[in-house]
Amino acid sequence: RQRQAADKAKYNDLVKASHAGVMIAFGTDAGSPCVQHNMIVPEMEFMVHLGLVDGNYGALRSATSISAKINKLDQKLGTLEKGKLADVIVMEGNPLEDLSSLTKVKYTFKEGCSML
């Protein structure tokens, strides 16, 4: 990824599309033989580094509400609202300040139940 980050020019068209209003959904190939699950945070950081999203908040939206909207699921999920489906994590730290906070999960709630 470091080599790719060094060559930001190869992502110019994607960044231009994003700045023109094209919705960019975060996604990875995590779990495939070449991409481990622990690559999610570095991939989000890479999106921020490229300027593809507006900071950490933009990266989080890309993984949640924007992904739901692109997949036409935004009436059911993607944001925390009454009546929507939601799995929630409680973490140490603030991902708006540091995306690596997403790796410091203290509690997970799935369909309203604690997954301790």
Where are these regions (language model features)?
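Active-site gating loops and adjacent loop-to-helix segments of metal-dependent hydrolytic enzymes
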Residues: 1-7
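Small/polar (Gly/Ser/Thr/Ala-rich) solvent-exposed segments
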Residues: 97
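His/Asp/Glu-enriched, well-ordered alpha-helical/loop segment
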Residues: 7-91
